[in-house]
Each structure stands twice: as structure tokens, then as C-alpha cells.
Amino acid sequence: MTNSNFNHGNHGSNLPARLFTKQSQALIYNYKEAAVQRMLDFDNVSQRDTPSVGGLIHPGSDGGMYKAFFGFKELVIPVYNSVSEACQQCPNADVFLNFASHRSAYQSSLLALREPSIQTVVIIAEGVPENEARSLISIAKKLGKVIIGPATVGGIQAGCFKIGNTAGTIVYIMACKLYRSGSVGFVSKSGGLSNEMYNVLSRCTDGIYEGIAIGGDAFPGSTLTDHALRYEKLPEVQMIVILGELGGWDEYGIVEALKKGEITKPICAWVSGTVAKIFPTEVQFGHAGAKSGGETESADAKNKALREAGAVVPTSFEDFSNVIAATYAKLQSKGLVKPVEEPTPPELPLDFKTAVKAGKVRKPTSIISTICDDRGDELSYAGVPISEVCKEQYNMGDVIGLLWFKRKLPPYASKFFEMCLKLVADHGPCVSGAHNTIVAARAGKDLVSSLVSGLLTIGPRFGGAIDDSARVFQDAVDNNLQPSQFVEGMKSKGKRIPGIGHLIKSADEIDKRVVLLKDYAFTHFSSTKYLEYALEVEKYTLQKANNLILNVDGCIGVLFLDLLHSSGLFTQHEIKEIIDVGYLNGFFIVGRSVGLIGHALDQRRNKQGLYRHQADDVHYAL
């Protein structure tokens, strides 16, 4: 049957007989990591000397290098930010594998077609607009280039070159013996069915020489007929297997070629979609080109035409493997195919993640985490799903309880945490931390650098006395020291008492923050033993100087002791660990970070210039 509407793609066929060799290399656009590694794994079992991936293209990137494995060795693959740069730097790469979406596949494919070094363009995307597909086909024909796709999984030349994810995993490739060449040329519209057919052909014949999935869109860049005519020219191919589908006219091109004697090698063919005849109206079957339309486009009509033209066509798909096996057996009996010498493919090492999952290796971990888990579907804090944290409106005190103390704390405790954060958030621009942050911000440093500049001043003299005050006051109480004994003991050691004393606050000018903390504790804590002891110490130190008051660091430190001891949530061992590890200074660090960020932003917002200290405020003692 002849039809003027028959689409021959790059027809005549002007396609070169041989698309790939063991030296073929691909440039992969908008690359996918799994596809890159699968191609390289295929190279390894096929005993290629050079990797089939020449370069990767990540449009808009800064380039760089991508690491993958080539057998046991790690390979560094260059990453380029444009098609032209990649082609210039990789002149031996003649295949362009395009993983761009249907929205951008046209432009990137067009750029590749115009590069002299690129001979074959593979378009993976499904749903490329038909006018764009036709434009690419026309341009490719004028330039003498080959397009596979759109809407294709790609293709494979056994033991030679694999396109992207064709044939799936390395396990499947080994099972189908795709690591060495057979004598069957296979072409299909469907990528999924082509994978299944590789398995069938490995069992019924000596395997494929080459397999191509042209893609299921209405306008493929190259057709079933194009590739069948290619296989006719390849001396390694002894028989051709074709898997078509209803819709379109492509299969009639093969019918014409058979009738004209352009194809003389035996063809086994099947057109899927015979079930379409039970539907009264046109139905779409998956692919854009698979439509149950007119009678001549039906699977039954195509199968009949192919059979009448000389192709071996089964009565059903279930019988396809039998006719393939019978056809191959005839070739064997005529001596046209010789037994394949089975090579021993090199062993492919397991990826570490795969080996761990399979329980084949063990490895000591590098990090222990007991506070959160980001595996699975949802992040959790100390076992509490993040969705629950949001749904139940956990406050920052609750979150600190989970991530620092590994438990949900009672409301009075989490509110105390929040109160501490609020009270230490800022204490003006003149303190050392804020001053450093301001100087750094005015020097043009970024937000993180300005923040860190201020945080680095936190220590025993500024904001870092919470842990130390908790340690010394707990030791004094636990050893039953009288306040006077404690103070004089510290004095005799030549040490200041952490948490006692302030530069500007005094008994006459009290620190309102300390008042707020004391009031909260007396109202909500079941015991304030350590606070009461600290206040007795304060009475004694005030006899020595009016500014030797219990400051905010000291007050927070002793109140944490009261909270930890009276809550009933912590063991003595846990309390000791919390104080020894240094949890408590964390509250000052987190809280003060809010204020330091505020100062940095304030300076930048007000466009303050470089800070230089006044010379008259310096005593030059030379």
C-alpha cells in the first residue's frame, strides 16, 4: 500500500548506516546523574577503552567538573555552560543527548544540529510541539544529521554505545547480553517495549546488534523505515525486528521498501494496538502518535500489509518470540550467522550505597546524630515530626527543648527559655559584641561576617558567664558553703565570681532583666534553691562594692540549675552533663544573635561609612 501522507522523516534513506562506534562520545545536555553513570557502567562491561560521556552541559552554570565512576576508577567529566563551548572543547563528541524539557528542547537541539561535530541528536522530552519537531526534522535533513526522538528512551549498539537510560540497569544489560554484539537490528516506537524486546531477542537469537526507540510522538526525527534501511546496509545485521504501533503511516514505508527490494534481509514485525478495533471512536493509546483513527492506520491493516509484503508477522504479540526464533533458526541452518564467542565482561563494582542496601558491606559512620532525623518522608526533631511541630504551634522554647535537651518540656520551662532569649537579645550598641558587629558592617562585610565578628567577643567577660556561674554556684550549694565562705574562697584563689558584677548596673540602678527573671522563677518554679543562694551571695558582695550585683548571666545560670533540678525531667547525670558540655551559654549566643543581626542591618540600612576610632580617645603611651 502506498500513501502520499506517509512521513519518511530523514528519508530516502539518507541516514548513515553506522551511527555509533566504540569511539563515539556524547555531550549530555541538562544531564541526569543516573543516566551518566549507567552509560559509563555499560562502557565498562562492554570493555570500551574510552568513556562514552565526553562532557556535560548545564546551561547557565559556572562550569566545573562532575565526578562519576568508569569501572573501578573515578572519572572527572567537564561541565560546560553552553552547547557551543562544549562542542569546541570536545570536538570528538558526535552525539548530543538532550534531557531538556519539552519547553526548551527545540532551541537546545537546534544549537546542537548547527554544530559541525554533532552528527546525532537524541531528544528525550515528550510533548515537543509538532511544529517545532517538524522544523528540527527539516533542518536535520538539510544538514545531513540524524535525530532520534522526541519522546524516546534512546537506543543502544550492543557492546559499543548506549544512550542514556536505554535498557535500564546494568543487571538487565548483563541478563540481555547487551555487552556484546549480536546479529539483530531492532527498531521500535516504544521505549518500554524495546527494553522487553531486548530480553526476548537475547533468548530467541544471538542478541541485538543495535536497537533504536524512535519515540512515540506524531513526528519522530527518524522513522522505523529509516532505521530498517540502515540495518539493510550493515553487514553485521542478519535480520531485522520491527515493533510498530497503530496510528500514522510509518510502517507502510517498510512495506514499500520490501516491495521495491530495498530491504532483502528477513524482517519479523508486529504492530501493536489490534485491540483498538473494539472502540467505536478514535482513542489515544499512550503515545501522541498512537491513535485509533482510519482503517489504514489500524494495527490490523498494517500487520496485513507487512505480511503481504514479505515480512514475518505473527498472529498475536504472544507469538512474536516464536516467529523470531524460527526466522533466526533458518539463518543458522543456512550458515548466515555464526555462534557468538561469549566474552567475559569485567566485573562491575557495586556502588557503595547499593552495596550497603544489599547488606554486602559495612562501614563505620562518621557522625552520630541523636537530635534529628532527615531520612524518610519527613524531618523530625527528637522523634517529633516537623508537621506536628508546626500544627501544635511549638514555640522556639519547645524547639530548643527538642534539639538541645531531646525532650518536650513543660510550658513553663519552654516559656522560660523564650524569656531568656528575649532578655539577652540586645543591650545597646556600646557593648563589645554589638560594637564589633557595627565596625565590621561599616567596613562593608557581609551579614554572616558581621554577626560572627560580634559573636567572637562572647566569653567570660561578656555574655559567656552563664555556664561558669551555674558551675560555681552548684558547687558551692552542693558543698554547703556559706555565702561568705564561697566569696572569700573565690577571692583567695584570685578569681572573679562568674555572674556577679556589672559595669553600669548597681544596687541603686537595678537591672530590670534580672528582676523579670526572678519574678518569673518565684511564680512558676517549684524550687528556687540556687537562686536564693545566689541572692544571699549578692547581699555579701554588695557590702564590698555597689556594682557587685547578681547580673543577668548569673541569674540565668542559677535559674537553670533550679529548673533542671526541680522539673523532675533530668537525672543527676544528665544535669552534670548539661552543665559540663556548656548548654547554657547557647542561650546567650542564640538570643544575642538577634540583636547583632539587627545592628548589622541597621548600619547597612543607614549607609554608614567605615568606622575609625577618634584619636583623642586613645592614650598613646610611647
From Swiss-Prot:
GO terms assigned for molecular function: ATP binding; ATP citrate synthase activity; metal ion binding
Positions of Mg(2+) binding: 245
Sequence positions that bind CoA: 306-316
Record EC number: 2.3.3.8
Record-annotated active site: 287 (tele-phosphohistidine intermediate)
Catalytic activity: oxaloacetate + acetyl-CoA + ADP + phosphate = citrate + ATP + CoA
Family of the protein in this entry: In the N-terminal section; belongs to the succinate/malate CoA ligase beta subunit family. In the C-terminal section; belongs to the succinate/malate CoA ligase alpha subunit family.
Protein name: Probable ATP-citrate synthase
Gene designation: acly
